[in-house]
């Protein structure tokens, strides 16, 4: 019944019974778990997974290989929330109840957990966040130095390097054109 609901599914995409998939969603070969909510106009690209009870907003792009965590295994207190218009780059991982606010862009390979430092480096002083990415932020993988008993080592983090601009929108606009003109990909 996907076609009647205006949902485009490319086999072997799977959405478990109990997941909500809205009109206009495109599921490339991907997996959407029980209790997940995927809102209209969203693209779940090849080999992306949407975990149990995750909340994905309108017009989101989950690129190839993205992993959006669920709440069932391991048990989590809060779902991952990806707000409207966000772009999640290839092979990103977003788990443990992290919230990505409206129109944020995560570059390829960003890994966000509840304890990952998300450091805004755009100003004269860094600003640290944990558990959420501010709206329209552009985020890339990074690292910071941490002292351990055995010495100083690099620990992964995420760096906010700017805000979404028209040039960013242009890079992500192909997705919108494909949806608007109902082009099968």
Positions of the model-derived regions?
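Structural signal for interior beta-strand "rungs" in well-ordered beta-sheet cores
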Residues: 7-147
